[in-house]
């Protein structure tokens, strides 16, 4: 639904460099190193707004969850919100809940306890680790929402 009306910027080698939505907003770019997608701050907002399922807050890990319903969402405690908004990484001890399809190396969205998007980044763990570990970096953030959404 999002990419139906998008335009693409093609580089000199014939590869897609950027994906632009119908309003002219750069929403994502392919990563050549691993084939993943780098989502921009505005792109994360657009994609997150299309989400229809709530974050699974029961804390139960489901190893057979598969691909899920889009990029996984990770919910953090209120204490971590101001740091994530400024582009700081998410540490395990501050995670409240996450989608069961969270996988290491994949893009995920970071939300506060009310479900408001506060950042996005690359997960360093799967859902089981996110809910069980207490020390270390769970998500390396790729945004500074405090500057993007003033």
Predicted region positions:
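Polybasic, low-complexity RNA-engagement segments
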Residues: 1-150
């Amino acid at each position: 639904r999002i990419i139906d009306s998008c335009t693409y910027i093609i580089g000199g080698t014939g590869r897609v460099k950027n994906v632009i939505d119908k309003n002219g907003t750069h929403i994502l770019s392919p990563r050549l190193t691993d084939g993943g997608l780098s989502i921009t701050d505005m792109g994360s907002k657009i994609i997150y707004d299309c989400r229809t399922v709530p974050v699974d807050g029961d804390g139960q890990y489901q190893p057979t969850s598969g691909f899920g319903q889009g990029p996984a969402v990770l919910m953090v405690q209120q204490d971590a919100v101001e740091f994530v908004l400024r582009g700081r990484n998410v540490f395990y001890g501050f995670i409240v809940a996450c989608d069961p399809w969270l996988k290491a190396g994949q893009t995920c969205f970071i939300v506060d306890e009310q479900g408001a998007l506060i950042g996005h980044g690359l997960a360093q763990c799967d859902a089981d680790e996110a809910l069980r570990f207490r020390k270390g970096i769970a998500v390396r953030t790729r945004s500074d929402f405090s500057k993007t959404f003033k």
